[in-house]
């Protein structure tokens, strides 16, 4: 994921926290805010020191970024997302992280549904 698609500034985080909607599951909390006219979504990641050491926190962030990269075509491009990892995410592998993110994004109805080919 390109750096220009990441939320880094505290003001941008606060704007999404204040004005955005949130939804969660056991592993992640996702805040989303619609940005009109944007041609690509932006994500901000937050992994607390309570989750684990730096290696663990960075691994979780890599997994989240890669999951968003793989789901890029299904994600609404006009939104900004903040993903906050919770403690259970520390013990998950990549596939579990991706599955959990798909679940929480479906709960928030920000993930486009795949076309159903069965009749």
Curated annotation (Swiss-Prot):
Could you tell me what this protein is called? Ribonuclease P protein component
Q: Which organism is it from?
A: Listeria monocytogenes serovar 1/2a (strain ATCC BAA-679 / EGD-e)
What the entry lists under Pfam families is as follows:
Ribonuclease_P (PF00825)
Report the HAMAP family cross-referenced here.
RNase_P
Gene, per the UniProt record = rnpA
Task: Report the EC number(s), separated by commas if there are several.
Answer: 3.1.26.5
Signal peptide location: none
Residues spanning the membrane: none
Describe its assembly. Answer: Consists of a catalytic RNA component (M1 or rnpB) and a protein subunit.
For this protein, the record's InterPro entries field holds: Ribosomal_Su5_D2-typ_SF, Ribsml_uS5_D2-typ_fold_subgr, RNase_P, RNase_P_CS
Q: What does this protein's UniProt record list under function?
A: RNaseP catalyzes the removal of the 5'-leader sequence from pre-tRNA to produce the mature 5'-terminus. It can also cleave other RNA substrates such as 4.5S RNA. The protein component plays an auxiliary but essential role in vivo by binding to the 5'-leader sequence and broadening the substrate specificity of the ribozyme.
């Amino acid at each position: 994921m390109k750096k220009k698609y990441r939320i880094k500034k505290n003001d941008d985080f606060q704007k999404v926290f204040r004005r955005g909607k949130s939804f969660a599951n056991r592993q992640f909390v996702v805040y989303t805010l619609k940005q009109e006219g944007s041609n690509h979504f932006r994500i901000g990641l937050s992994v607390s020191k309570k989750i684990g050491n730096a290696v663990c926190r960075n691994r979780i962030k890599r997994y989240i970024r890669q999951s968003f990269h793989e789901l890029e075509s299904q994600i609404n491009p006009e939104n900004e997302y903040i993903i906050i990892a919770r403690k259970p995410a520390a013990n998950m592998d990549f596939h579990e992280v991706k599955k959990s993110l798909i679940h929480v994004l479906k709960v928030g109805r920000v993930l486009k549904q795949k076309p159903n080919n069965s009749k």
